[in-house]
Amino acid sequence: MASPGCLWLLAVALLPWTCASRALQHLDPPAPLPLVIWHGMGDSCCNPLSMGAIKKMVEKKIPGIYVLSLEIGKTLMEDVENSFFLNVNSQVTTVCQALAKDPKLQQGYNAMGFSQGGQFLRAVAQRCPSPPMINLISVGGQHQGVFGLPRCPGESSHICDFIRKTLNAGAYSKVVQERLVQAEYWHDPIKEDVYRNHSIFLADINQERGINESYKKNLMALKKFVMVKFLNDSIVDPVDSEWFGFYRSGQAKETIPLQETSLYTQDRLGLKEMDNAGQLVFLATEGDHLQLSEEWFYAHIIPFLG
């Protein structure tokens, strides 16, 4: 049996550990990682029926979170107009500068882009690694671009084909590329060389004209790259672009998944390596473009933000 003196020494020795344990119990939990949101075409940062509602849903489930919903312009109306007419590269530069100056983001942040905001935030991840983006969630983003108009009657329609060809005839002109946002991610699978040489945004971030190693390194630094596809999407054509798939080159009928594209097989962006490492997450939901239920959002998106 230990003597009283030995027990006293043991108690003294354990005292610092006991105090430390109690102190740790009273420490505040770490603040949740901030969230940056970029809205889609024709929307604004703070529409109570869209991004405003998303912000409230996130704040409800993650108390204390800092949510920055990007406003591109000085007014809500300007924000909406810029989603159509402000050069995408200029928008990305402006956002990168704003994020770098925000003291609440310096330890890292998650990002969630809706529709075209998905590929715009990917450009931020690739071009602006500081502050670091941790998870990127693309909700209906078009990462291989679009080659079709909203709610066309169908792939076999001669009218749709005619409209596509007409738009494509001017989509890659310098003036259109500089002034029309949607032209900057217009991707013609029939004239890949024209797209590759004249697309000032999408062809660049998808490494179509050469390999920018920093783009690849920065994208691969993401913990998770989550892509949400809408199974009944009537806006995005082809809908496979929401999972980084696209039309097979040379035609506009058959689509192929990401894993069969040259972007993946040549691993120009590191997507193949990310896929093998479990960094890519492919989610699908019923409904039309950006039609998400609260229940689905809470179950499938919130876990990547907590």
From Swiss-Prot:
Known catalytic reactions: S-hexadecanoyl-L-cysteinyl-[protein] + H2O = L-cysteinyl-[protein] + hexadecanoate + H(+); hexadecanoyl-CoA + H2O = hexadecanoate + CoA + H(+); S-hexadecanoyl-N-acetylcysteamine + H2O = N-acetylcysteamine + hexadecanoate + H(+); S-hexadecanoyl-N-acetylcysteine methyl ester + H2O = N-acetylcysteine methyl ester + hexadecanoate + H(+)
Coarse class of the protein's main subcellular location: other
pH dependence, entry free text: Optimum pH is 7.4.
Cellular component GO terms held in the UniProt record: axon; cytosol; dendrite; extracellular exosome; extracellular region; Golgi apparatus; intracellular membrane-bounded organelle; lysosomal lumen
EC number from the UniProt entry: 3.1.2.2, 3.1.2.22
Enzyme class: hydrolase
Annotated control of activity: Palmitoylation reduces PPT1 enzymatic activity.
Compartment(s) of residence: Lysosome; Secreted; Golgi apparatus; Endoplasmic reticulum
Example GO biological process: regulation of synapse structure or activity
Signal sequence interval, chain numbering: 1-27
Active site: 115, 233, 289
Post-translational modification: Glycosylated.
Gene Ontology MF terms: long-chain fatty acyl-CoA hydrolase activity; lysophosphatidic acid binding; palmitoyl-(protein) hydrolase activity; sulfatide binding
Subunit structure, interactors included: Interacts with CLN5. Interacts with ATP5F1A and ATP5F1B.
Record protein name field: Palmitoyl-protein thioesterase 1
Natural source organism: Homo sapiens (Human)
